[in-house]
Amino acid sequence: MSIDLKKRKVEEDVRSRGKNSKIFSPFRIIGNVSNGVPFATGTLGSTFYIVTCVGKTFQIYDANTLHLLFVSEKETPSSIVALSAHFHYVYAAYENKVGIYKRGIEEHLLELETDANVEHLCIFGDYLCASTDDNSIFIYKKSDPQDKYPSEFYTKLTVTEIQGGEIVSLQHLATYLNKLTVVTKSNVLLFNVRTGKLVFTSNEFPDQITTAEPAPVLDIIALGTVTGEVIMFNMRKGKRIRTIKIPQSRISSLSFRTDGSSHLSVGTSSGDLIFYDLDRRSRIHVLKNIHRESYGGVTQATFLNGQPIIVTSGGDNSLKEYVFDPSLSQGSGDVVVQPPRYLRSRGGHSQPPSYIAFADSQSHFMLSASKDRSLWSFSLRKDAQSQEMSQRLHKKQDGGRVGGSTIKSKFPEIVALAIENARIGEWENIITAHKDEKFARTWDMRNKRVGRWTFDTTDDGFVKSVAMSQCGNFGFIGSSNGSITIYNMQSGILRKKYKLHKRAVTGISLDGMNRKMVSCGLDGIVGFYDFNKSTLLGKLKLDAPITAMVYHRSSDLFALALDDLSIVVIDAVTQRVVRQLWGHSNRITAFDFSPEGRWIVSASLDSTIRTWDLPTGGCIDGIIVDNVATNVKFSPNGDLLATTHVTGNGICIWTNRAQFKTVSTRTIDESEFARMALPSTSVRGNDSMLSGALESNGGEDLNDIDFNTYTSLEQIDKELLTLSIGPRSKMNTLLHLDVIRKRSKPKEAPKKSEKLPFFLQLSGEKVGDEASVREGIAHETPEEIHRRDQEAQKKLDAEEQMNKFKVTGRLGFESHFTKQLREGSQSKDYSSLLATLINFSPAAVDLEIRSLNSFEPFDEIVWFIDALTQGLKSNKNFELYETFMSLLFKAHGDVIHANNKNQDIASALQNWEDVHKKEDRLDDLVKFCMGVAAFVTTA
C-alpha cells in the first residue's frame, strides 16, 4: 500500500492523568479484529485497504495481504458506530461527532449541532453526509476546492415519519450529480444536497428494508428486506425490475461483482453468503455459516472493485476473503462458475477468553481458550501469524475416518490447559480439560492441531485439572472424584494412578527433576508424592477448600488460592506454609508467579489486580479495573503481563516497568491503589513497549518515598573508634600491594613459535622490510626501530618535566589530590582530602602517596601527615588511616628517617604520635580484659 506521506511524531495532548500503577503500564490488546460495525473499503491507486471497527478504535488492513497497517492513535470517547473511507482519509462516527483520520491520526473533528447520535455516513464529491437517529441528515462541504476533506457545514435535511421513518442507509448512485439516495425502512428518497430539496419518493414497500447497495448499472439500486427478498429498483422509472427471494433469511448485506461477471452476493443474518448469477437468473453457490448466526451473521460482504475477491466480516470477530477462480467453459457454450475459494482471514475469539498461557520461552505465541469453544495461538509480534488450532480428528488406525457428520460442533469449552515444549514436534505437547467431559485431549503445537490421544479419568469423574512434566513425557489428569491419572504423552498409555483426595483435584504439579509431585483439592488437602516410587510422602491440611494452584519450579514454591480469599505459599521441600497473603475481598479468579519467583500477581472479583512481594509478604502494587480480570500470566522473561477480562474478546498486554527501571517495593494499602483503564488497540504516535514502561507513572517519586528502612550511622558517637564501612579486602590489598604486583608479573616473556606454517612465515613487518629492500630503501632492524622510539619518548618526557615549572619556580601543574592537599593546609581542614582518599581504589591510593614531593622543604609529606592526624582524631575509618601511614613509611621512610631533625617533619610526627598513643588505650583495655578472663577461667 503506497502512501506519499511520511510518519511524523504527534505531540500528546497535555491532560490531567489519574494515578497509575508503579509496576504495570498498559501496552496493547491482541486478538481483536472487528465487531458488528460494517467495515469500510478504500482505494489508493490500484491497491485496496479495509477499515474495521474494534469498539472505540479502528484498524486498517492491506486488502492484498490482510497485514495490519495502522491503528487509530487514541480511543474515541464512545464506541464507533459507522465507518467510511475516501482515498487517504477514514471517517469514524461516534456520538454526535465525526472524526477524520489519516494513517490513524486524527486530522479534524466535526461536531454536529444536535444531541442525536450519528448512525450512517456517505462521502461523495465535495460532500460528507451524516444521518442521525432522529432522522436528520447533516451535509458538510469543502470550504475550498483544494481542501482534502469536507469540513464546513452546508445544510441539514430532515426525513419525516410520513416519508419513510427510520433511515437504513445513505447511498450515492453513479452519474447522479449532487444527489443523495436515502433508504428508509419503507421508502427510497432522493435529495439534491446542493439545493436541499426532495427530488423523488418511491412507493412504500410492503416489507421492511434492511440494507441497500447501488448496482454498477445506471439508475439501479438493490434493496434487501427482512423477509429475504432482494429488490432491484430503478430510480429513474420508480419501479421494481426484479425480485430475488431467499426463504427464511434476513438480508444484512449486498454487493455486486464488477470484474466482468454479473454476480450478486447476498449476506444473511444466519451467517450464509449466497451468490446469484444475474444473467442466468439463478443461484450459483452458497457459503454456509461463514460467520456465526448468534453474532448477527454476515454484517458486511463487499466485492473489491474490479477484482474477483469478496471480503466479509461479522460480529464474531473475524475478517475473511474469498476469491473466484476463472470460470470453466463447456462444449455447449455453458460457463461453469467455480465456487469461491477461501483466500485468507484474520480473526480471534468471539467470546471472552477462559484460559491463557504463553506457548514458548521467547513470548512469541500465546495460547488462548475461550467460551466460544475455540483454541487460538496468538502471535505477539505479527498478527498475520495468529491462527485457530484445528479440531479435525485424526484417522483411525485402519486408515478410516471417524464416523459421524462432517459438519460437527466444536469441542466443549476448555477449563484447564498445560503446555511443555521439551518434546515439541516429536509428539503432542498440550493437554486440555473440557467442560463436563470425562477425558482430556492432547494437541500438537507445531501442527496447530488436535492430537491423537484422549486421556480418560479412572473413576468416571469429569476432568478438572491437567499438568505436564517438564520433560514432556507425562501428562497428569485430575478428576472431579479425587483421583489422579498419569499417561505417557508419546504412546498414550496409562502409567500411574493416585487416590488421595475425596473431592475434586484442583491442581497438580511436578518438579523439574520428576522426583516430587504435589496435588491439591477442594477438600483442603495438599498431597506430596515421591513420583519415582509412587508413594505418598505426606499431606498438609488447610483450613479452607483450595480452588487453584500455581507452581514455581526453580524455587520449589507453590501458591494456593483458598475459598477464604487468601493466597497460601508453601515450600515443597519443607512441606510448610511460608507465606499467607490476605487482602482480596472477593473470590480469587487467577494468580501467577513472576519468573524469578519474587512476586505473585493475583486478580479477584473485587475488581483489583494486586502484586505481592514474597520476601516481605506485603502488597506492593494494586490496580482497580472496571472489568474484572479472569486470567493473569507473566511472560517467561518477565517483561509482559497478560490479562483477560469478563467482557472483551481480546488479551490485554501490560508492560512490567520493573524490567526497565527501579520501582518501589514499599507495602501499600488500598487507598493507594491506582484506577486504570485497560490496554487498547490504539497507539499514540510511535509508542512502543519501552516508551510505555519508561513514561512517568504520575504516582510516587522514588526520591520522595520514605521506605521505612534503617540506614547505618557513619559514627555512633565521636568518643568511639569507628572502622570503615568498606570491604575488608581493601585494607588487606593496601598493605600487600607490592606482593600482589610481584605475583601478577609474568615469570618469563612470551616465546615466539619456532616453526610456523608456510602461510604465516612472513609477518607484516617482514613483508614490509622485503619491500623496502626491493625499493632501495635503507633497512632497519626491529631493535633499531625500538631504540629510536625509546629515544623519542625520552625527549618527550624531558620536555614534559620542564613544562611543569614556570620561570618563577612555582608549580605550573598539580593533580587534583595535590591541590586538595595544598588547600587543606591553608585552611587547616583536610576533610575533603580524606573523603577523596577513602574513595580511591588501592592502586590509586598507592600512586598518590608515592607521588608526594620528597624534596625540601617536604611540604607535601608534612601536609599528608597532618591530614592523617586530623583523620585519626575524628575516630572515623580508624584502620584505613593507620594503613595510609604505613604506606607513607614504605614509600618515603628513607626520606623521613634521613631528615628526622627537620622541624616541620618532627612536629608533624610528634602530633601523630600523641594522637596515636591516646587511641592505644583500646589495646590496653582489650589486653586487660583478656588477662582477667584468662585468670578467671584458669583459677
From Swiss-Prot:
Coiled coil: none
UniProt keywords, alphabetically: Acetylation, Nucleus, Phosphoprotein, Repeat, Ribonucleoprotein, Ribosome biogenesis, rRNA processing, WD repeat
Modified residues (N-acetylserine): 2
Chief location of this protein within or outside the cell: nucleus
Subcellular localization(s) per the UniProt record: Nucleus, Nucleolus
Residues found modified as Phosphoserine: 772
Any GO CC annotation of this UniProt entry: nucleoplasm
Biological process (GO), any one: maturation of SSU-rRNA
Pfam families per UniProt: Beta-prop_WDR36-Utp21_1st, Beta-prop_WDR36-Utp21_2nd, Utp21
Record InterPro entries: Quinoprotein_ADH-like_sf, SSU_processome_Utp21, WD40/YVTN_repeat-like_dom_sf, WD40_repeat_CS, WD40_repeat_dom_sf, WD40_rpt
Domain of life: Eukaryota
Domain notes: The WD repeats are grouped into two tandem seven-bladed beta-propeller regions.
Subunit structure: Interacts with snoRNA U3. Interacts with MPP10. Interacts (via WD repeats) with UTP18. Component of the ribosomal small subunit (SSU) processome composed of at least 40 protein subunits and snoRNA U3.
Further details from the record: Present with 2020 molecules/cell in log phase SD medium.
Biological role: Involved in nucleolar processing of pre-18S ribosomal RNA and ribosome assembly.
Name assigned to this protein: U3 small nucleolar RNA-associated protein 21
Organism (species): Saccharomyces cerevisiae (strain ATCC 204508 / S288c)
